[in-house]
C-alpha cells in the first residue's frame, strides 16, 4: 500500500503505494494525480493520494496515505505515510519517506550513486542494483526490475507476472494484484495482509 500495502503487517508493499521506475508514457499522459479509497475487509479505513509534478525529463511523485483501523468506535491502528520520489529521464534518482505505523516511526532515503542505489533505512545501509525501484504500484514497468520496500528500505523477494493486459500479480513477500486502465494509469489494487485480512484500493 503504501498500504504500504505496503502497512498493516504485509506492510507497505503497497505502499505504499511511491513510485516506479521507467515512467510509462501512458501513465504520465494520464492523470497528474491519483486518489484511492482504501478498504480493509470491505470497510473503508483511509485514503492514498499520489501527485505528479514535472515531465518525462524530471518527474516528482509525492505520496500521502492516511489510514485508521477501528474496533467498533475505537481506533486500534493508525497509519500515516509520506514519500517524495524523483526520476530523471525516466530513471530512479531518489526517494525520501517518513512513516508513522501505529506510533512506530520509520524513515528511508535512497539515491542513485556510483552505479548503484544506496538505501538508508532503520536496519542500516543497503546497496541495491542500479536498476532497482521502490514498489509503489502506479507504474507497472517497474515490475520487471528488482524492487525494494519504500517504508522499510529492504529488498523484496517477489515474483511478478502479467496475468492479462492491465492486470499484474505480485507474489512472495507481498501478495498483491494491481490493475491499470486502458491508458496505463493505476486503477485498483487487491492484497492480503499478514493477519489474513483483505485490503483493496479503489480509485476515486
What would you call each of these model-derived segments?
Residues 45-48, 78-82, 104-107, 173-175:
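Short, surface-exposed coil-to-beta transition loops
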Amino acid at each position: 500500500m503504501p498500504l504500504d500495502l505496503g502497512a498493516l503487517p504485509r506492510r507497505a508493499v503497497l505502499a505504499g503505494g511511491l513510485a516506479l521506475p521507467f515512467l510509462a508514457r501512458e501513465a504520465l499522459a494520464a492523470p497528474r494525480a491519483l486518489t484511492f479509497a482504501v478498504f480493509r475487509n470491505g470497510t473503508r479505513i483511509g485514503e492514498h493520494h499520489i501527485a505528479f509534478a514535472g515531465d518525462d525529463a524530471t518527474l516528482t511523485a509525492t505520496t500521502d496515505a492516511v489510514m485508521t483501523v477501528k474496533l467498533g468506535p475505537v481506533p486500534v491502528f493508525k497509519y500515516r505515510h509520506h514519500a517524495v520520489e524523483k526520476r530523471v529521464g525516466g530513471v530512479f534518482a531518489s526517494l525520501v519517506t517518513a512513516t508513522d505505523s501505529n506510533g512506530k516511526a520509520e524513515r528511508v532515503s535512497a539515491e542513485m550513486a556510483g552505479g548503484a542505489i544506496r538505501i538508508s533505512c532503520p536496519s542500516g545501509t543497503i546497496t541495491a542494483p542500479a536498476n532497482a525501484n521502490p514498489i509503489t504500484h502506479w507504474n507497472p514497468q517497474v515490475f520487471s526490475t528488482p524492487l525494494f520496500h519504500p517504508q522499510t528500505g529492504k529488498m523484496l523477494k517477489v515474483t511478478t507476472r502479467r496475468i492479462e493486459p492491465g492486470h499484474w500479480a505480485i507474489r512472495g513477500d507481498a501478495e498483491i494484484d494491481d490493475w491499470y486502465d486502458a491508458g496505463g494509469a493505476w486503477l485498483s489494487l487487491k492484497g492480503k495482509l499478514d493477519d489474513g485480512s483483505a485490503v483493496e484500493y479503489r480509485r476515486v
